[in-house]
UniProtKB/Swiss-Prot annotation:
The lineage of its organism: Eukaryota, Metazoa, Chordata, Craniata, Vertebrata. Changing R168H: In VP; strongly decreases enzyme activity. It comes from Homo sapiens. Monomer. Homodimer. Keywords: Disease variant, FAD, Flavoprotein, Heme biosynthesis, Membrane, Mitochondrion, Mitochondrion inner membrane, Oxidoreductase, Porphyrin biosynthesis. Changing G332A: In VP; abolishes activity; impairs protein folding and/or stability. One of its GO terms (molecular function) is flavin adenine dinucleotide binding. Its cofactor is FAD. Changing V282D: In VP; strongly decreases enzyme activity; impairs protein folding and/or stability. Its EC number is 1.3.3.4. Expressed in heart, brain, placenta, lung, liver, skeletal muscle, kidney and pancreas. Changing P256R: In VPCO; likely benign; results in reduction of activity in a prokariotyc expression system but has normal activity when expressed in an eukaryotic system. This is Protoporphyrinogen oxidase. The gene is PPOX. Binds 1 FAD per subunit. Changing G453R: In VP; strongly decreases enzyme activity.
Length: 477
């Protein structure tokens, strides 16, 4: 009788793990268990009354590097090439990004000319920060906060404006708490290997082999900065679900896992609400803190390490305006915590993907709310109403982008505990978990955003690596 692998979590990580397991030459029996009634996790696309697409979660995927190429290969394998909407390298959404500081939008400098000129909100040309960076000695600590690292190497302005904003935009987190080693490993490794971020990025970490396809070659030739799908990014998990069903994968929806226990023969018993499953191996693609509550008593050290990986909430407010125009053209802007602790940033959806504006077309923007403002609200126990978030988002759009009219359409979603926080020492939590799994030979593999990357590409790769670990070899296509 063949092996049974149970995959916990039907987000993009669990779907990717199930996909690669199902494509093995002799695939195991795969059962995908999802607590909610839908698959895709935080990837969710909604069509508005005029046909416009609103992304409630991720809205674009970067094609760069080996991970970006592997995701494009997955898109091709699923037959979605004709649905891809690329943002090419010469597009304003690829070239222009902004910071909102001092009540005004400031374009981030690009190219050598931009680095040599004074560029508000920075008081000096960023060239000088780069020159300073080349002279700084290598850090001696095994980890450091993003703020400390950036301030030490690039100066206080870059730390408090650029890196603070970047941490809010990517992790909805605090740069004074997040780990440089885990959040931005390429920067950490560049300093460790080459003593300098700039030298490390210029010299690179060596070429990583990446797959090849017509879509990957097109993305390279046209220098895509990001891409989406015509009907929204949720087309990707939907196509994965269709593929899994065709491959005989059992998909259980609306089935929260109540507990995991080890049987005498070393197999798992996966307890569901009204039934149970037996598995030779479990891939967990659910949040680390959730998994920690399901583990048996004999895995208490593992549960402790996983429970320490926390996550923060983000309110996503999609707004559409008829007849309105943006003051600038670009991807969007980020807001440092010193400017507005509640508004993380605003994405100019219509600039990158006008094909999704609907008919008649309307200007779409997405306001991300979170940070210390939202954490304080959550801790106070006050009612987090849709009206509160909509008002806050409309005020931000009016103040920061001049969109003072009432939106024609608005969607508000509070994503509770959606972005894991890789705080200082995160790598030690991962090491503790790995050591326990190895020492006790537990048939359990960890995947998902809780561990080594929160972006869609990271999650898909995490699922693929989990499948490779279980199979012991790369699955055939």
């Amino acid at each position: 009788m063949g092996r049974t692998v149970v995959v916990l979590g039907g987000g993009i990580s669990g779907l990717a793990a199930s996909y690669h397991l199902s494509r093995a030459p002799c695939p195991p029996k795969v059962v995908l268990v999802e607590s909610s009634e839908r698959l895709g996790g935080w990837i969710r696309s909604v069509r508005g009354p005029n046909g416009a697409i609103f992304e409630l979660g991720p809205r674009g995927i970067r094609p760069a590097g080996a991970l970006g190429a592997r995701t494009l290969l997955l898109v091709s394998e699923l037959g979605l090439d004709s649905e891809v909407l690329p943002v090419r390298g010469d597009h304003p959404a690829a070239q222009n990004r902004f910071l909102y500081v001092g009540g005004a939008l400031h374009a981030l400098p690009t190219g050598l000319r931009g680095l040599l000129r004074p560029s508000p909100p920075f008081s000096k040309p960023l060239f000088w920060a780069g020159l300073r960076e080349l002279t700084k000695p290598r850090g001696k600590e095994p980890d450091e906060t993003v703020h400390s690292f950036a301030q030490r190497r690039l100066g206080p302005e870059v730390a408090s404006l650029a890196m603070d904003s970047l941490c809010r935009g990517v992790f909805a987190g605090n740069s004074r708490e997040l780990s440089i080693r885990s959040c931005f490993p390429s920067l950490f490794q560049a300093e460790q290997t080459h003593r300098s971020i700039l030298l490390g990025l210029l010299l690179g970490a060596g070429r990583t082999p990446q797959p090849d396809s017509a879509l990957i070659r097109q993305a390279l030739a046209e220098r895509w900065s990001q891409w989406s799908l015509r009907g929204g990014l949720e087309m990707l998990p939907q196509a994965l679900e269709t593929h899994l069903t065709s491959r005989g994968v059992s998909v259980l929806r609306g089935q929260p896992v109540c507990g995991l226990s080890l049987q005498a023969e070393g197999r798992w018993k996966v307890s569901l609400r009204d039934s149970s499953l037996e598995a030779d191996h479990v891939i967990s693609a659910i949040p680390a803190s959730v998994l920690s509550e399901l583990l048996p008593a004999e895995a208490a050290p593992l549960a402790r390490a996983l429970s320490a990986i926390t996550a923060v909430s983000v309110a996503v407010v999609n707004l559409q305006y008829q007849g309105a125009h943006l003051p600038v053209q670009g991807f969007g802007h980020l807001v440092p915590s010193s400017e507005d602790p509640g508004v993380l940033g605003i994405v100019y959806d219509s600039v990158a993907f006008p094909e999704q504006d609907g008919s008649p077309p309307g200007l779409r923007v997405t306001v991300m709310l979170g940070g210390s403002w939202l954490q304080t609200l959550e801790a106070s126990g006050c009612v987090l109403s849709q009206e509160l978030f909509q008002q806050r988002a409309q005020e931000a759009a009016a103040t920061q982008l001049g969109l003072k009219e009432m939106p024609s359409h608005c969607l508000v979603h509070l994503h509770k505990n959606c972005i894991p926080q890789y705080t200082l020492g995160h790598w030690q939590k991962l090491e503790s978990a790995r050591q326990f799994l190895t020492a006790h030979r537990l048939p359990l593999t960890l995947a998902g955003a809780s561990y080594e990357g929160v972006a869609v590409n990271d999650c898909i790769e995490s699922g693929r690596q989990a499948a490779v670990s279980v199979l012991g070899t790369e699955p055939n296509s």
